[in-house]
């Protein structure tokens, strides 16, 4: 057994049941650690019934801090951070393992929406102008071509960062670049991880030979004040840390 799979949950009971019911058949192949951020529903009970080892937090620590709590509670050489709404293809872990053994990197399968369309989880440099273009500001739309690159056809492509919904790496690689920055409660912590990897020469990869579905429903596509507060707060933290991206 080489893999620790770490999932951070918060009121995630519905997506756990629909995406992780397969785990018990594979429980001898890898450890599944669920860090629960003080859910108010029956997430903990469902995770335990599915075979996960559950770590209960008495408060909502946020995504990065939850990932780090799971990381400190694990010990195997390979780590996969996987959202509760991610549909893992467990047989693909062998392919990810081969990539991680070849080089120091962060790597994810290509993610798909539930309807099979591409979900571009590998992104280019997160210049502020590119982020604004992605939010619909047309004056910067020329930035989107490099920010939202087309995945390689049946191969591996190098990007700047990958969505935190699915990140695999070696434990020793995380020790080199550092774990998740807990200053971000949610949003931008995956941008930050990718930027730190880039600076240290650690590649960030998307493997389009592997395709996993992700039930992505970003809260900031609606009028959710909690989500927007943390989006703006995390953006301020991020661009203060990387002022070279303010263009």
Model segments located where?
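Acidic helix N-cap motif at the loop->helix transition within catalytic regions
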Residues: 16-17, 41-49
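A conserved acidic beta->alpha catalytic loop
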Residues: 36-44, 59
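Short, well-formed alpha-helical segments that are part of the catalytic scaffolds
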Residues: 12-26
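Conserved donor NDP-sugar-binding/catalytic core segment of glycosyltransferases
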Residues: 87, 91-121
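Short aromatic/hydrophobic "clamp" motif used to bind/position activated sugar donors
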Residues: 79
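Short, flexible, basic/aromatic active-site loop/helix in glycosyltransferases
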Residues: 126-160
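A short, conserved alpha-helix in the catalytic core of glycosyltransferases
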Residues: 160-211
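Glycine-rich, basic loop-to-helix element that forms the pyrophosphate-binding segment
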Residues: 57-74
């Amino acid at each position: 057994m080489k893999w620790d799979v770490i999932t951070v949950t918060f009121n995630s009971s519905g997506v756990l049941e629909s995406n992780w019911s397969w785990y018990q058949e594979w429980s001898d192949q890898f450890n599944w650690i669920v860090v629960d951020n003080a859910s108010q529903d029956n997430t903990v009970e469902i995770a335990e019934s599915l075979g996960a080892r559950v770590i209960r937090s008495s408060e909502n620590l946020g995504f990065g801090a939850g990932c780090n709590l799971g990381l400190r509670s694990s010990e195997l050489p390979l780590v996969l951070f996987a959202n509760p709404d991610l549909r893992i293809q467990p047989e693909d872990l062998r392919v990810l393992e081969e990539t991680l053994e070849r080089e120091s990197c962060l790597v994810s399968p290509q993610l798909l929406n539930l309807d099979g369309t591409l979900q571009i989880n590998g992104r280019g440099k997160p210049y502020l102008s590119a982020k604004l273009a992605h939010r619909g500001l047309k004056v910067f739309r020329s930035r989107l071509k490099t920010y939202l690159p087309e995945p390689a056809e049946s191969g591996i492509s190098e990007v700047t960062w990958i969505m935190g919904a699915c990140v695999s790496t070696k434990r020793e690689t995380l020790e080199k670049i550092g774990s998740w920055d807990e200053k971000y409660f949610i949003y931008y912590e995956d941008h930050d991880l990718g930027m730190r990897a880039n600076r240290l020469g650690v590649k960030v990869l998307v493997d389009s030979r592997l395709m996993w579905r992700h039930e992505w429903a970003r809260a900031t596509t609606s009028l959710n004040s909690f989500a927007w507060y943390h989006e703006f707060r995390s953006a301020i933290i991020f661009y203060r840390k990387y002022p070279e991206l303010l263009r």
